[in-house]
């Protein structure tokens, strides 16, 4: 009778692999299981080999990102929500810097590419809501603006999570996103307030306006 796989062992090995990446140490069968209490056979049991480890590690990065974005509550202010998604993206990178190093390494395929695509589609839907609400011009391409917004979050996150800048540098997201969204047609003052509400909160999941009472007008 086949033994049931223990999800905790899989998570343990993924965390170990991420730690090795963060420490810039080689990720091999032996280094992966060292100090974990499991054998090298577990790598084959749970991942089919080292290539499977890298695929799963990339996927885990997007799984955690998706969970972070899903925790951002939808408010009556779509521009605030768009900024909050960017803030959640940056926060995820800072909280999981080792996984963040691996997420965008296209040397190994993702187990579920659709899950990665969904993270961008959340931003696209927020842009579409902003257009419907009259915040952005009708000629704005949702995918294009969402990608530009993602690029800003990705750049700041990379410089803070794995680069030379301090955490405080994330505050630059407010003026940069404000400039981007104003260029898409939003009113400058209203846009600034929306972005500050979305990007400036430490916990984007808890920052949704209640009943629209603090949505900018």
Ranges and model annotations:
Residues 8-17, 32, 57-61, 65, ...:
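Generic hydrophobic, amphipathic alpha-helix propensity
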Residues 12, 20-52, 56:
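Helix-turn-helix
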Residues 21, 53-61, 103, 119:
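Alpha-helical DNA-contacting segments of helix-turn-helix folds
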Residues 59-82, 114-118, 129:
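Amphipathic alpha-helical linker/stalk segments
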Residues 70-99, 120, 149:
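Hydrophobic alpha-helical connector segments
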Residues 80-83, 114-118, 132-148, 168-171:
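All-alpha amphipathic helical-bundle segments outside canonical DNA-binding/catalytic cores
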Residues 91-132, 158, 167:
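Short secondary-structure transition hinges
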Residues 121, 125-133, 165-217:
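C-terminal peripheral helix-coil segments that are non-catalytic and often amphipathic
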């Amino acid at each position: 009778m086949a033994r049931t796989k223990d999800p905790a062992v899989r998570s343990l090995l993924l965390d170990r692999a991420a730690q090795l990446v963060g420490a810039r140490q080689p990720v091999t069968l032996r280094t992966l299981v060292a100090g974990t209490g499991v054998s090298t056979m577990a790598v084959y049991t749970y991942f089919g080999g080292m290539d499977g480890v890298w695929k799963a590690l990339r996927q885990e990065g997007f799984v955690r990102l998706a969970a972070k974005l899903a925790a951002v509550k939808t408010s009556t202010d779509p521009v605030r929500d768009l900024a909050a998604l960017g803030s959640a993206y940056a926060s995820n990178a800072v909280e999981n810097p080792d996984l963040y190093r691996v997420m965008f390494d296209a040397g190994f395929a993702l187990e579920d590419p659709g899950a990665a695509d969904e993270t961008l589609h959340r931003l696209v839907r927020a842009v579409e809501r902003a257009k419907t609400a009259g915040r952005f011009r009708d000629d704005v391409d949702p995918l294009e603006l969402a990608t530009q917004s993602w690029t800003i979050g990705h750049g700041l996150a990379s410089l803070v999570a794995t680069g030379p800048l301090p955490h405080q540098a994330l505050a630059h997201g407010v003026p940069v996103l404000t400039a981007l969204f104003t260029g898409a047609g939003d009113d400058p003052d209203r846009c600034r307030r929306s972005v500050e509400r979305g990007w400036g909160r430490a916990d984007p999941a808890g920052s949704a306006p209640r009943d629209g009472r603090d949505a900018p007008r």
